[in-house]
Amino acid sequence: MARQNDMGREGESEARAYLVKHGYNVLHTNWHWHHYELDIIAVKEDELIVVEVKTRSEDFLLSPEDAVDTKKIRRIVAAADAYVRYFNIDLPVRFDIVTLIKKETGFLIDHIEDAFYAPCR
């Protein structure tokens, strides 16, 4: 489990660097609200972007984005709503997923913009 946690932290660090390199202003990482967590919150072009980061090893059977199921989406949206209210943010919100596959020489990164929308309640 420790190896998996280390890889996850390394993946989040790589995802953050990737976003900064591509013009995102990262506001917070690992922001907690109750038992929920937002991996990365950033702003780009007057839009608040909530980024879920998924890191996997090369030999993992499922693709990283498949781990973002309906339950996970609801938690991310609830935490994002709390974030917007807490910081009194008046920007449109976009939900992205950054996937990282660990290779021998580093990470293969895929950035999925508008990966999902907030479900209707």
Curated annotation (Swiss-Prot):
The lineage of its organism: Bacteria, Pseudomonadati, Bacteroidota, Bacteroidia, Bacteroidales. It comes from the Bacteria. Belongs to the UPF0102 family. GO terms for molecular function: nucleic acid binding. CDD domains: PoNe_Nuclease. HAMAP family: UPF0102 (MF_00048). SUPFAM superfamilies: Restriction endonuclease-like (SSF52980). This is UPF0102 protein BDI_2565. It comes from Parabacteroides distasonis (strain ATCC 8503 / DSM 20701 / CIP 104284 / JCM 5825 / NCTC 11152).
